[in-house]
């Protein structure tokens, strides 16, 4: 066979094979369509699975095509029910670590926000860490000058408890340089205070949507708790301050339902000072342990009833829990009046345990370093100095900061009482260290039925960062 005939023969065979292959594909497609058409009638290939959760229903649609599964998740809102939160606080013997975010250590090479004032609050399903960002990242030029409390760049954001405040997992909550947040069992309510010092505004969000506002009534830095607000049977309560930080100011209790204010009352507290209350539910009421930034080294307390009647005074215990403070031996407690003459202060907390109290404080009397929690026998009702429990959380060689309270709801814990928990902020950078920035991380502890050994769960970041050396 001559070369030309060979080429023609090979070409003809190749063309025939191509045509045969195309016909096979057409037959395969027809058979597949017929088979899948029959399968749809008995639902063997296409099926929809519905799984229900506490707060949402997740529809999982599975489409199978030639052994390939495509899963599509379609979340939609299920209202749920209000949390009761009328149970008593559990009596606990110690506090075990719940979470630690290590945000500053991670932030030396990760995309982590510069923050302050972190706090924790829980829904029936999850606990979240809320924090006030500075609109900047660690180890970045915009972190310069973030020691400043109030700026238009500050926002309230949140992550699941234990996560660092990073840009990939954080959820925006509100524009704010002061804030509080809590869950009523159905949706999150967040309150963010922002604006100029003389005309600040608190914007209430419910389920992520702005629902109400509070305008500054005294024209002097309207501010709120910097920790969890408290919801009982669908109504949520929080405390706000407007006025000077170093003399008499004005204080109000607010009550909201589904993010709309349904009640408020002025707190009469002449000669006393209330800021940054740490509140929790207990026996159907809201109990708050606050900060006196004027004179007292003992802490103000507020006990709020659902009808907004209240009792105000000071934590009776014969040991001071604010910073700075004098020596314990020279302190005499009072249930009604500020004691000591140390101005300034730091946000703190306490938990009533019958007539006893667990109260947190820095270990240092003069600076925000170290942290311990003490149980004082009869310290809620009497000027007792008797310590019946003590636990160190951060040693005095390391920085601490603000601290505050929250509870685990019975829907989460499975117990018939509310588990008391607290967080400790660990501030790094300015003004104590040679950096251009100020930020913090936190350790979170929850009450248990056993004593827990002392240790130091300090921040641990090695400073300065690269940005501080430029």
Swiss-Prot record:
Residues 32-86 are annotated as: Hypervariable stalk region. GO terms for molecular function: exo-alpha-sialidase activity; metal ion binding. It comes from the Viruses. Inhibited by the neuraminidase inhibitors zanamivir (Relenza) and oseltamivir (Tamiflu). These drugs interfere with the release of progeny virus from infected cells and are effective against all influenza strains. Resistance to neuraminidase inhibitors is quite rare. Disulfide bonds join 90-417, 122-127, 182-229, 231-236, 277-290, 279-288, 316-335, 421-446. Residues 89-470 are annotated as: Head of neuraminidase. Glycans are attached at residues 42, 46, 54, 67, 84, 144, 293, 398. It is a single-pass type II membrane protein. Residues 11-32 are annotated as: Involved in apical transport and lipid raft association. The keyword Ribonucleoprotein does not apply. N-glycosylated. Ca(2+) binds at residues 292, 296, 322. Its cofactor is Ca(2+). Homotetramer. Belongs to the glycosyl hydrolase 34 family. The influenza A genome consist of 8 RNA segments. Genetic variation of hemagglutinin and/or neuraminidase genes results in the emergence of new influenza strains. The mechanism of variation can be the result of point mutations or the result of genetic reassortment between segments of two different strains. This is Neuraminidase. It comes from Influenza A virus (strain A/Quail/Italy/1117/1965 H10N8).
């Amino acid at each position: 066979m001559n070369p030309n005939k060979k080429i023609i023969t090979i070409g003809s065979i190749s063309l025939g094979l191509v045509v045969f292959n195309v016909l096979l594909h057409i037959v395969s497609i027809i058979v597949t369509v017929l088979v899948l058409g029959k399968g749809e009638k008995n639902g063997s290939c296409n099926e929809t699975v519905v799984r229900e959760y506490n707060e949402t229903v997740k529809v999982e649609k599975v489409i199978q095509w030639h052994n390939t599964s495509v899963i599509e998740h379609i979340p939609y809102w299920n209202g749920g029910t209000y949390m009761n939160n009328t149970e008593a606080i559990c009596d606990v013997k110690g506090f075990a670590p719940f979470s630690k975010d290590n945000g500053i250590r991670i932030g030396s090479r990760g995309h982590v926000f510069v923050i302050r004032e972190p706090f924790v609050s829980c829904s029936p399903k999850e606990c979240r860490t809320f924090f006030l960002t500075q609109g900047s990242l660690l180890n970045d030029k915009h972190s310069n000058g973030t020691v400043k409390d109030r700026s238009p760049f500050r926002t309230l954001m949140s992550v699941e408890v234990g996560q660092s405040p990073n840009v990939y997992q954080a959820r925006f909550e509100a524009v704010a340089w002061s804030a509080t947040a809590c869950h009523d069992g159905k949706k999150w309510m967040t309150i963010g205070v922002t604006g100029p010092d003389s005309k600040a505004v608190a914007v209430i969000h419910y389920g992520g949507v702005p629902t109400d506002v509070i305008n500054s009534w005294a024209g002097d830095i309207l501010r709120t708790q910097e920790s969890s607000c408290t919801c009982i049977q669908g109504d949520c309560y929080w405390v706000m301050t407007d006025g000077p930080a170093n003399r008499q100011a004005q204080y109000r209790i607010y009550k909201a339902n589904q993010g709309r204010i349904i009640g408020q009352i002025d707190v009469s507290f002449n000669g006393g000072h209330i800021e940054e209350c740490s509140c929790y539910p207990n026996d159907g009421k809201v109990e708050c342990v606050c900060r006196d930034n004027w004179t007292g080294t003992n802490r103000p307390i507020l006990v709020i009833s659902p009808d907004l009647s209240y009792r105000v005074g000071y934590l009776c215990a014969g040991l001071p829990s604010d910073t700075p403070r004098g020596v314990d031996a020279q302190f005499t407690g009072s249930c009604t009046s500020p004691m000591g003459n140390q101005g300034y202060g730091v946000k703190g907390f306490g938990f009533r345990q019958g007539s006893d109290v667990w109260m947190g404080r820095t270990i240092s009397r003069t600076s925000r370093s170290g942290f311990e929690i003490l149980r004082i026998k009869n310290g809620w009702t009497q000027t007792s100095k008797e310590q019946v429990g003590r636990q160190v959380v951060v040693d005095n060689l390391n920085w601490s900061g603000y601290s505050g309270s929250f509870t685990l709801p019975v829907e989460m814990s499975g117990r018939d009482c509310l588990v008391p928990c607290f967080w400790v902020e660990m501030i790094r950078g300015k003004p104590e260290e040679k950096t251009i920035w100020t930020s913090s991380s936190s350790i979170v502890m929850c009450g248990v039925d056993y004593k827990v050994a002392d240790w130091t769960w300090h921040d641990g970041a090695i400073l300065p960062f690269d940005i501080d050396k430029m």
